[in-house]
Amino acid sequence: MDSRARSSSREAHGRSSRSSSRDDKKAKAGRGSRGRARPDAGAERQSTGRTATRGEPRAPAATATVVDVDEVRGPGEEGTEVVALLESERPEEGIKPSGLGACEWLLVLASLIFIIMTFPFSIWFCIKVVQEYERVIIFRLGHLLPGRAKGPGLFFFLPCLDTYHKVDLRLQTLEIPFHEVVTKDMFIMEIDAVCYYRMENASLLLSSLAHVSKAIQFLVQTTMKRLLAHRSLTEILLERKSIAQDVKVALDAVTCIWGIKVERTEIKDVRLPAGLQHSLAVEAEAQRQAKVRVIAAEGEKAASESLRMAAEILSGTPAAVQLRYLHTLQSLSTEKPATVVLPLPFDMLSLLSSPGNRAQGSINYPSSSKPVEPLNPKKKDSPML
C-alpha cells in the first residue's frame, strides 16, 4: 500500500512539473510573438475552435476592432520622420560594390596578361585624363569598382572589361518651364523658375538616376505647387525671395539622397490670366484716381485757406489794398499794352468796398426831395457891384 501511494504521489508530482514547464514555454512564446499579435490571434481563434468539444454549444463570436498604435500617425509626424532620417543619414562616398565571380576574375587576369604582353602599345589605350572639374566612375563587367571616384589626373582601366562615365562637378543651370499653380486665395497663375545645382556624389548619382534634368524639373514643379498652395497672390508677388529659399530647402532635402546639391532656386516670371490682369488693372486705376482726387481736394483746401488769410490781411490795411490795385493795373498794362485801362478813383473803390455799402447792395445817392446842387455853381455878382 505504501509503495502504491508513493508511486501515485510521484506521478502527480511529475504531471504538475510537466504542466508548469508547458505553462512557462507558452509564456515565453507569448512574449516572443507580441510583434505578430494580429496573425497569431487569428490562428489561436482557429485552434481553439477546432479543439472545442462537439457536444458543447458554441458561444456567439464577439467582434472587436484591433488598432495598431504604431501605424497611427499625425499629419506632421510623417514629414518629421523623413527629415530626421535625412539628417541622420551621412552622405556615403559611393555604393557598396559587389564582388566579382570566378569567371570574371579569370577574364580580368587574361586582360592584364594581354596588356603586359603588348605593353608599349596597350598603355596608350589603358590610361585616360580627367580634368579638375570632372570625376570618373568605372564599372568592371557591370560592377561598380570599390573606392572613390577617379580624378583629377590619370586613371587606369581595362579597355575590354571596363566602362567609365565622366561626371561634371561644375554648377549647372536648369530652366523650369511655365506650369500652373493654384494659390491660397484660389487664383490660377503660371510660374517659371530656374534651378542651380551641382553633383556631389558621382557614384550615388549614376546608381540612382537615369535622367537628372527630368527628375529635378518634375521635383521643382511639384514642390512649388505644394508650397505656393499655402500662399496668397499678394505674398507670391511680394515675397519671391523667401519663397525661393523655401523651395531650395525642400529640394535639397530630397536631392541629397541622389548625390545632388541644390545651390539656389529663383522665380523668374509670374504670368496671370487675361481676365485677372484686367481686373487688377481696373482696381489699380481706381486707386490712382482716388489718390488724385484726394490730392486735388487737399490743394483746394490749402488755396482757400491762403486766400482767406490774404483777405483778412488786406481788409485790415487799406494801404495794402491800394498797392494791390496799382499792381494789378501795372500787370494788365504789361500783358496787353494795346488795351487802355481807365482806373476808377480809389475813393470810389473804397466806398464800394465798404461793409455798409456791401450790405445795402448800392451806393447812397442824395434824395430826390432836396434840390441837387450843381457841381460847379455859378458865382453871383455881389449886390455891391
UniProtKB/Swiss-Prot annotation:
InterPro entries the UniProt entry points to: Band-7_stomatin-like, Band_7, Band_7/SPFH_dom_sf, Stomatin_HflK_fam
Disordered as annotated region, ranges: 1-64, 357-385
Protein localization: Membrane
Sites of S-palmitoyl cysteine lipidation: C103
Entry GO terms, CC: cell periphery; cytoplasmic side of plasma membrane; membrane raft; plasma membrane; protein-containing complex; slit diaphragm
Regions of compositional bias (Basic and acidic residues) in chain numbering: 1-27, 376-385
Gene3D superfamilies reported for this sequence: 6.10.250.2090, Band 7 domain
Polar residues bias locations: 357-370
Ranges in the topological domain labelled Cytoplasmic: 1-104
One Pfam family recorded for the sequence: Band_7
Membrane topology: Single-pass membrane protein
GO BP annotations listed: actin cytoskeleton organization; gene expression; metanephric podocyte development
Residue spans, topological domain Extracellular: 126-385
Claim: Lipoprotein is one of the keywords in the record: yes
Entry annotated with the keyword Membrane: yes
Protein keywords: Lipoprotein, Membrane, Palmitate, Transmembrane, Transmembrane helix
Parts of the chain that traverse the membrane: 105-125
Top-level taxonomic group: Eukaryota
Assembly information from the UniProt record: Interacts with nephrin/NPHS1, KIRRL1 and CD2AP. Interacts with DDN.
Family as reported in the entry's similarity comment: Belongs to the band 7/mec-2 family.
PANTHER family membership: BAND 7 PROTEIN-RELATED (PTHR10264), PODOCIN (PTHR10264:SF127)
Biological role: Plays a role in the regulation of glomerular permeability, acting probably as a linker between the plasma membrane and the cytoskeleton.
Protein's recorded name: Podocin
